[in-house]
Amino acid sequence: AVGEEAKLMLGRTPGNIRAVRPLRDGVIADFDAAESMIKTFIQKCNEGRGILAPRIVIGIPSGVTSVERRAVREAGLAGAREVHLIDEPVAAAIGASLPVTDPIGTMIVDIGGGTTEVAVLSLGGTVLSESVRIAGDEINESIVAYLKKAHNMVVGERTAEEIKIKIGSAFPDNDFDMTSYEVRGLHLLSGLPRS
C-alpha cells in the first residue's frame, strides 16, 4: 500500500508487514521507499496514457540542502523522464491562486507534515523565505502527549491527525461544535477503551 492507503495502516499492521514513512521533516528519510512510492504514484497517474514516462514536478522545502535536493530528483527519476523541483511555498501559492507573478508582495504560510514554510513572493520569484522543520507531525505528537498527560488517554497517530484536522482547520466547519469534542482511546492505567 502507498499514500493514503498506507497511512490508514499506520499503527495497525501485523508483525509481518512494516509500515514506513519515506519522508521525515520534509526530506527523504528512506530512499528506497521514496523511490518506490514515487514510481507507484506515477504508475497510477499514467494508467492508460501510453508507455512514455511522464515529466513531473516535485515540491521541496525551500531550506533543503543540495544533497537533499539531489536525492529528491534521483528518486523522481526512478519513474519519470524529467523531474522539475519547485519550492513548496511557490507551489502552495500557485495552488491557492495567489498573484505570484504580480509586482506586489504576496505572503504565504504553508504548514506541511514535516516543514512549515513562510515566504514572500513577487514577480514569479521568492523574495524571502524561511523553512522550519516543525509542522503537522509535531502537532500530532503534541496532541498525543497532551491527551496522555491531561486525560490519561492513549491515542494513535491517526486519531491525533483526525483531531488536528477537525479542530485546527484554517477553514472551520460551520456544522462543527467547538465547545466539546469526543475522543476515543485507551485509558493509560486500566488499558480499557474510553472516551
Regions found by a protein language model. Give the residues of each.
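Short acidic, Gly/Ser-rich segments with clustered Asp/Glu that frequently serve as metal-coordination loops
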Residues: G113-T115
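Nucleotide/phosphate-binding catalytic cleft detector across ATP-hydrolyzing
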Residues: A1-I111, V120-S195
